[in-house]
């Protein structure tokens, strides 16, 4: 039966948010540590020295340990201002306005075509659309369980450049293809 694309996305969103919320604390901790290791091994994909990330909620993969590691390595880390699109402020610093070179985005579900499904508000799609022409790199982070073979896509949906899970790094466009995790 043909479904309205918005309804189909809503159903997928609900399904994958439930999958994400059901991940236990010990696996979540493992995934956060694996994310740090994969980032360390693949820092050549990171553009510039200023990286924006997010504060996890709703079962999102915990990027706070990664943010701490990036600070330790000398990167400037920023978080988006949810009240003002395209504004970022320093994290663990003076909260000054920052312009990131690389943006780490949360993901509800992703596919092999580098499509991401988020909460449905279009916030990250708008950000990607506005900042990609400026050469910014967009990295989606998720649990491998959030993989969906083919996501429904609308005209406004924006693709990611890289997707990192606890298991591997997937690179799109002109970037090298899938890099397996090394321990």
Located regions from the model:
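Surface-exposed, charge/polar-rich loops and edge strands
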Residues: 1-7, 22, 94, 98-103, ...
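N-terminal active-site beta-alpha-beta segment that forms phosphate/nucleotide-binding
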Residues: 2-99
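A residue-level signal for conserved active-site and pocket-lining positions in enzyme catalytic cores
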Residues: 16, 53, 77, 104, ...
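Glycine-rich, N-terminal phosphate-binding loop of Rossmann-like dinucleotide-binding domains
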Residues: 55, 107, 167
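Short glycine-rich anion-binding loops that position phosphate/pyrophosphate groups of nucleotides
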Residues: 57-59, 108-112
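A structured binding-face within diverse protein domains that lines the active/interaction site
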Residues: 89, 106-109
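Charged helix-capping and loop-helix junction motifs
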Residues: 119-125
């Amino acid at each position: 039966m043909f479904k309205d694309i918005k309804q189909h996305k809503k159903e997928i969103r609900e399904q994958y948010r439930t999958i994400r919320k059901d991940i236990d604390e010990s696996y979540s901790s493992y995934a956060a540590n694996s994310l740090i290791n994969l980032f360390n091994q693949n820092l050549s994909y990171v553009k510039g020295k200023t990286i924006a990330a997010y504060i996890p909620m709703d079962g999102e993969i915990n990027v706070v340990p990664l943010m701490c590691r990036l600070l330790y390595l000398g990167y400037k880390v920023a978080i988006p201002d949810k009240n003002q699109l395209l504004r970022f402020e320093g994290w663990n610093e003076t909260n000054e306005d920052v312009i990131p070179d690389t943006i780490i985005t949360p993901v509800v579900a992703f596919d092999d075509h580098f499509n991401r499904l988020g909460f449905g508000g279009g916030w990250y799609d708008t950000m990607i659309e506005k900042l990609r022409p400026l050469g910014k790199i967009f990295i989606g982070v998720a649990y491998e369980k959030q993989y969906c073979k083919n996501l429904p896509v609308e005209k406004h949906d924006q693709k990611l450049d890289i997707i990192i899970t606890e298991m591997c790094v997937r690179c799109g466009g002109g970037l090298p293809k899938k890099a397996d995790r090394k321990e």
